[in-house]
Design a protein with these regions (language model features):
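NAD(P)-dependent short-chain dehydrogenase/reductase
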Residues: 1-27
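A short, mixed-charge helix-start or loop-turn motif at secondary-structure junctions
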Residues: 19-20, 103-106
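Residues that recognize and position ribonucleotide moieties
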Residues: 27, 78, 117
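Mid/C-terminal beta-alpha module of Rossmann-like enzyme folds, strongest
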Residues: 37-104, 121, 135-146
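Active-site loop of classical SDR/Rossmann-like NAD(P)-dependent oxidoreductases
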Residues: 60, 108-120
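Aromatic-glycine-rich donor-binding/catalytic loop that engages nucleotide-sugar donors
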Residues: 127-131
Length: 148
């Protein structure tokens, strides 16, 4: 089920109440905004080109706040700094080594949560008759589905 994996777990966690947010940013895209360009590309003469599919780059604080608002929940208000995340990473590895719990943090994951890398998904819009869905509408739809 969607709410048990991937982005769905994030929605479920925010619905339960999320107090912390990573300090980095993330590129987001709706599922339909991945599928529709793929179909358009298969029907086009475009060959051997790569496309980045990102509708918007958002700070985690803003993204999690928008999702929380659409779920009628309080937005997270405490930053998860790089130092705090690395402390959690070390604790995670210790608990894993002791056999107490399964590991969930990696150095790469910590770095990605703190990264402010921006992605440009505009190439697909220039090459095809395509435009990304409004992020706000997509998040509201997902939140409505979750509440149902």
């Amino acid at each position: 089920h969607f709410w048990e994996r991937s982005s769905g777990t994030l929605i479920r966690r925010i619905a339960k109440g999320l107090r912390f947010y990573p300090i980095g940013s993330v590129g987001i895209v709706a599922l339909e905004d991945v599928v529709n360009p793929l179909i358009l590309l298969m029907e086009s003469n475009i060959k051997n080109e790569r496309f980045i599919l990102v509708s918007e780059n958002l700070k985690y604080k803003d993204l999690l706040g928008k999702i929380a608002k659409s779920l009628d929940k309080k937005p997270p208000k405490f930053p998860l700094t790089k130092g705090l995340l690395y402390t959690l990473y070390v604790l995670d590895k210790i608990l894993y080594a002791l056999g107490i719990k399964k590991s969930f943090l990696s150095q790469a994951f910590v770095q990605s949560l703190c990264s402010d890398q921006k992605y440009d998904g505009s190439k697909i819009e220039k090459k095809l008759a395509f435009s990304y869905q409004d992020t706000k509408i997509t998040l509201e739809k997902i939140s409505k589905d979750y509440k149902a």
